[in-house]
């Protein structure tokens, strides 16, 4: 039995839905985790994949076997991989919802974290980097933790298996995902997510700066710094407790401020005192956070179809595998997408997936592809099907890299 890959970072972030703590992992490929020299780092293109797990009440978590297969294949191919637990999965905080909407925000939270993290990485060590102990590596004439100015945007795959693919299919376009994180209110979950992404990116950048410094000093001789460092586990929060604000508090504050402003204006009109000035209502502090827009792709493994999908997330009634069109379907259809499924899946209709896949492929400028694996069930335990799953992932990765 293979030994599972070791996460480079294990940490938590709050969900933008209600601040529920989400357990997360980031895996670095060997090119980043154990580079032989600076040339390894310089050749790496920023590319990563987020993979969501199956239904938590049925044992789904980021330790799922099929999720692990995706982690292994993409790590081996040089991709960074991010996984997370939906609320209530594998002992995580909270509980699985009946609607699916909180889980949609859970995915959005981690996807935004992942995109900010990969945008802030600077694996290409250059001579204008300044190293200061106990501080982040800083580029000359560039602010700390700014996104990398690279020749190409990061490539990010948003993926999901089973229930994870159901949530994935309801995600809005990437610009919409990132919008709440562009100027987050200080102390909110969105602000906390951006801060954690930057802090972990700073830590990775510092590792590479140390490697560059060691290589310069040792002139490519053997050094202890080339040994793999132990994984980092990080909990807690980046914001101090007195400044941390829950998502509910922020919504209540903003709604209350709006109601107060309306009442003030009505009172002013009724007493004909328009000439009097009112003190402005203090607004929560906002921070600017920019990130590089990634080149996004989608990966769906064993996607659910009705009635299973309706039972798992009734509030996300979605007819992706039908003939009707909606915004979610358009998001998937307009990007490079792979759907892999088995023809013996007890939780999905292979005929529905097959028919709709052919329709999507036939549309103008379609970038949708699908692979149907004969004899494969939902859990990919049947004889020989894991090999075919891995093969399909390898072929697709080679085609899109």
Label every PLM stretch briefly.
Residues 69-93:
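Conserved alpha/beta-hydrolase
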Residues 59-69, 350-351:
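The serine-hydrolase catalytic nucleophile loop
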Residues 58, 94, 376-389:
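Catalytic histidine-centered segment of alpha/beta-hydrolase-like enzymes
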Residues 38-56:
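Short beta-strand element of the alpha/beta-hydrolase
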Residues 333, 338-341, 345:
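Short beta-strand/loop motif that positions the catalytic acidic residue
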Residues 307-312, 346-355, 381:
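Conserved alpha/beta-hydrolase "acid-adjacent" motif
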Residues 96-148, 175-220, 230-238, 243-245, ...:
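Alpha/beta-hydrolase active-site loop
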Residues 1-44:
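N-terminal cap/lid segment of alpha/beta-hydrolase-fold proteins
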